[in-house]
């Protein structure tokens, strides 16, 4: 027996060569079914017992502070608190969460960790079922962060680290009939923490299930299931390797395959152990092998995830079933062929996302229900793949991916991003075993899942000898799947696929201080390198941090154009915000530094496509549209015909309806629907109208298409929209201005302070006052009521986006970041001066000209020339010319802002929507007549920034204001400066007034990454002169 004092003295958690002690060898998940029927039906096993629930808990400052008697079976823990298992103790009122992206939250001195090492001790009393006593009983911890020692009934059992894979211990010789006691000492930091630097919250504790498993003394120890298909992918076979817990000739393994309705597909086939010769020394007597032919099996894919069920039973010499296991089986073949990744002979297009396991209240302790929400959202938004960034996921995740149809890149729990260089530990021989176990144990646990199509060696650990060893072992252990790894350049000998991060479509990414070094080539260029025949799949791309995902569609144009560009995985799925309550009792989502964690990387954990509660970011719609499985094009001719191309590889569209409409100036003038039948990888031409609708001068015409489900699916209900398209139809342009209504000019008067323009306004008296000192409309009366709180002013500023700020680490600011350039120029501090103002009465209007200069420290940066044309109907046409200093960096926006009284009326507009969109993110936002509440016009990004824009607007109604022209629209109750200064949504101050921002031009948001200027050139405002016009009026 190992004494407690010896354990403390040994400090296994600071020895990289001690990764485990007395841990059971890794294997596929086991359930210990008592019969074949129970295994077939997947009944709850009587030989499994979850130990989740309330445990006794105490947190100590360091392992040395733990009293040695707390491991005793009779220790009185009544003064301790209860804690929920599974959970992270930082979210149960102990210690504090820490977020870092790259740097370690402690001194980088591997394998040593801080002396102040929070240590949680868990205790649980449980009762062993009487029927279990003469069996082999193990306890399985599915996830404990970061390392732990285990005692049973006061006796030390073993030690484990690796937070994301199971640790199983044999308790058979420690258990007693009736009551038993477990004690677990969990350390926050261990040498394993150096391998788990994965751009997420550092959280601790028993955060996955704890389970007791009882097996016969001689039982099934492991099972490997694989499938094969013939060269034509018509007929197949299932291969099953069954391993015994010890060598014996007294048993037979029996295997039978059942279909999705649990009807038998094959006969029951038995095989003895030790039948096949392994080498010249003979067979393995603990191994039985089956290869069973399966004619014309249903094949598994993300589109049609058909699952069989294989039941494996251990039968003794008397014909009695002593142990049974069962697994879901998908018939599919993954291969690399002709420079492409293929499944069942078809080249895949990966519509992928990186996904952290995260819950805003439970941290890393996620439930089946939480996982199911993610699965359905992924399917609904046209994702077909997920990368388990950057660690093996909860075992249930893979079952759901098997069932619902998602391709999985299963990634080892390995990242050393904070090392200098990153490969420091990857070449240190003393760390080899730690690396290898993280790979080998993942493969052994997850090998039977059809959804897993690629193994990954980990993330951002440089490239070292250990990676080559991991790669070679994996290829030999499982030749049925490719292996990928980005480290060392994304195209090394340790990867079967080129898997770069954040490589651009057409532009090489160079190092600032080494312009001749090309660490990331443009993805199109990469394919053309000499002797390069591998496919390219971006393991991370399109950094979705806040208001992002600009120019995302360009990646998808390239993916569809180049067959060896086979998609990628967006970074990432969910904002890793944690729920916190402020002093006013309001909830908000916290990020790095919000818990007093001094070493942190602020909001860099907030880069998901969905909020922590899984409500959607606007960027999701863009991803869904770009990734959709149907493409549309208009067919030339007199009839309204559309060509539909199906990107489904395996299934015909049998459960979908095509709904279409034609709009004139946003109003539907024709519509229809038809059942959609398009075979996989084929096209179909449909005639929607026998002739084009008659056109009116000056109206815009659009064809709008939706593909909707006409029956329920496991992941969505009938009526759900899976694909959309909008096609601009020919229109007759308005060649001349629409003549104004015949009437006289409004009345003009002025004094030394103001210019006043008054008129009848279609029967309603109006009066405008323009302040001569400011050059701005100071009052706009209609029927005696003032309609504005502040008149239109130049607006060149936006509250900085994460992509504008440009940093991935809190202390590493990019001097080329947009916000740095704007701050240097003083854009946020421009001081406007009215240089000249004059007014004149024309035949039917009053013309007011104003000249502005915008200065920083008496230096003129921007001049703007405004011309108000005010007619007797109360309409104000605003023409603006803007001139920029040659030295000025591209501006974030050029337009105007005015302030209106608060209103509960919804905003109506004819333009892109209904969701937020920006000039480089408009693919999913169709032009139509939209209506949203004021609240819906605001996007509550966790780190507040510019938001809520709607592009390409022709006309809009905000409160009593009507606007027409060509502009982008944003409406908010928050000022731009408040948004810019706020760190969280609870810092936003509702001013109970409406800020109406009318942009003629707006810079793109970018999003190829978030730490360098990533807005594409065509979406930069880099001209020296701009002109725009719009018309304002009040009802």
From Swiss-Prot:
One of its GO terms (molecular function) is carbohydrate binding. Binds 2 magnesium ions per monomer. Mg(2+) 1 binds at residues 415, 417, 460. Belongs to the glycosyl hydrolase 2 family. It catalyses: Hydrolysis of terminal non-reducing beta-D-galactose residues in beta-D-galactosides. This is Beta-galactosidase. Na(+) binds at residues 199, 604, 607. Mg(2+) 2 binds at residue 600. SUPFAM superfamilies: (Trans)glycosidases, beta-Galactosidase/glucuronidase domain, Galactose mutarotase-like, Galactose-binding domain-like. Its cofactor is Mg(2+); Na(+). The active site is at residues 460, 540. GO terms for biological process: lactose catabolic process. Substrate binds at residues 101, 199, 460, 540-543, 607, 1011. HAMAP family: Beta_gal (MF_01687). Homotetramer. Keywords: Glycosidase, Hydrolase, Magnesium, Metal-binding, Sodium. InterPro entries: B-gal_small/dom_5, Bact_Beta-galactosidase, Beta-gal/glucu_dom_sf, Gal_mutarotase_sf_dom, Galactose-bd-like_sf, GH-type_carb-bd, Glyco_hydro_2, Glyco_hydro_2_AS. One of its GO terms (cellular component) is beta-galactosidase complex. It comes from the Bacteria. It holds the Pfam family Glyco_hydro_2_N. Its EC number is 3.2.1.23.
